Design a protein with these regions (language model features):
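Conserved HGGG/HGGXW glycine-rich cap/lid loop of the alpha/beta-hydrolase fold
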Residues: 17, 55-101
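Active-site loop/oxyanion-hole signature of alpha/beta-hydrolase fold enzymes
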Residues: 45-48, 93-133
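Acidic catalytic loop of the alpha/beta-hydrolase fold
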Residues: 256-260, 286
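Catalytic active-site module of serine/aspartate enzymes centered on a nucleophile-bearing elbow/loop
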Residues: 276-306
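Flexible "cap/lid" loop of the alpha/beta hydrolase fold
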Residues: 144-148, 155-186
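Alpha/beta-hydrolase fold catalytic core
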Residues: 2-62, 86-89, 305-306
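Conserved alpha/beta-hydrolase catalytic His-Asp/Glu region
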Residues: 167-173, 183-244
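Short beta-strand/loop motif that positions the catalytic acidic residue
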Residues: 245, 251-253
Length: 306
């Protein structure tokens, strides 16, 4: 009988850990019970409901759309959103499917899915032209937007963009329940703390990991991350086309980014987008818009006011 107690203890601990994760369903009740502030809304798009922020809708300036990265949703843009709101810009940010407060869908999470989500939102808002700012994986999304509908694009502004990396699409893009279970078991206990590695000076961002822990409560988050990764591919052809269309392109990098390492693709980037304007933000890692806000804000304003 005594031998049963260690096994029982381990079983209880295991169940306790599993119960921490992915227990909230983002269905209609989630949307209806959400407490929105004055800038926040939900809209039902083709693949599901989308959470977004919008302000200064009557501004005469070109609307600016902020697209977040791989896993952290639109709150990653909060400092920039507030700054541009105060400067009188019409600003839109949103949570892409599978992230934050938007629907976790059952299908494949592709660049095309995200791009169409943004385009449908802009159609809902009756926006015909906008400047697009893509952070990290959001760079892939704005590239795909330009690929689908270049007429809607004013400026393309890439911030620490991962869209220029060499990627091979997985042969099998379906996500199994086993893959989800293993991802949660292997990654969820440490994934929030890992977000601090995006910063050059993580000690300045106390609580950033705690905020990410909240995302782990939503059922389907792990599947969304796995599916997104499986559906990545090299975007060289799209970027060549962007260059041929003479769309205004700007790239902004943290000078100490260890997540997207500039030197690994800089030569290819010069070949793909030789006419881009490029900026490096000092004393910042993968999130220069947070880590060196003064310098980043000066750069983004110089672009948007040009």
């Amino acid at each position: 009988m005594r031998l049963l107690f260690p096994f029982l203890f381990l079983f209880i601990v295991s169940c306790s850990q599993n119960n921490k994760y992915e227990y909230i369903l983002k269905e209609d009740n989630f949307k209806y019970n959400f407490e929105l502030n004055k800038d926040q809304s939900f809209v039902d798009l083709e693949e599901g409901f989308t959470f977004y922020n919008a302000t200064n809708q009557n501004s005469q300036k070109t609307p600016v759309v902020l697209i977040h990265g791989f896993s952290v949703p639109s709150y990653i843009w909060d400092p920039t959103f507030v700054m541009l709101r105060e400067k009188g810009f019409y600003i839109i940010s949103l949570d892409l499917y599978g992230r934050g407060n938007s629907k976790n869908i059952d299908g494949d999470y592709t660049d095309e899915l995200f791009a169409n989500q943004v385009l449908q939102l802009l159609n809902h808002l009756e926006i015909e032209k906008a400047d697009f700012v893509g952070l990290s994986n959001g760079g892939r999304v704005i590239s795909k937007i330009a690929d689908i509908n270049s007429d809607i694009v004013g400026d393309l502004i890439y911030v620490a963009s991962s869209s220029f990396l060499n990627k091979s699409k997985a042969l099998e893009t379906d996500v199994s329940k086993k893959e989800v279970r293993e991802f949660i078991g292997n990654n969820y206990p440490t994934i929030a703390k890992g977000q601090l590695q995006d910063f050059k000076y993580p000690e300045k961002f106390e609580g950033w990991d705690d905020k990410y822990e909240e995302l782990l409560k939503y059922k389907g988050f792990a599947r969304a991350l796995i599916s997104t990764t499986k559906n990545h591919y090299t975007m060289d052809e799209i970027h060549e086309n962007i260059n041929n269309l003479n769309l205004p392109v700007y790239t902004i990098w943290g000078d100490s980014d260890n997540v997207v390492v500039y030197d690994e693709f800089s030569e290819r980037l010069n070949e793909l987008l030789p006419n881009r304007n490029e900026y490096f933000i000092s004393n910042s890692g993968h999130l220069p818009q947070m880590e060196n806000q003064d310098e980043f804000n000066k750069v983004i304003l110089s672009i948007l006011n040009d």
